[in-house]
């Protein structure tokens, strides 16, 4: 009986010592791997910079992970023009055009429709309409001498782009990835591939 009591007492002391060490570790800022992994998984993206075929798309988010700003390459005067869109609670709030040749803006009519969450760029020879949702672009409609084409963007519930569909035909399907992806491959319905690289900043 004495041996059993001694063993139990030793076990109690060991448990107490472990609990004390755990408390001490917490107080000194030393965390378990499990807690660190959980924190890593819960990181909120502040800025995402995506590059595809020489084009750069920038998305910025608030600390709650909501999209607040998007810098999108749109060709108005040259292929280096960009438009900066701002968002509030997932809705389009404003836009600003940075054109390499500002004079060309006089030849383009720009209309923003907040109720439809879209912006239209209309010129003598073509027209483009960008429609947004809480994840970014939801649809692009391009019209010109050859008719109109609509590209629909499909996302999963985490906001990851799954595919771009044009005229009921999958234009690009993207490989599976996490929210922290750094390289993504898109494959069109003809087997052609495009590669997007991304750098991410966190809050």
Language model features with spans:
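Bacterial Sec-dependent N-terminal signal peptides
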Residues: 1-24
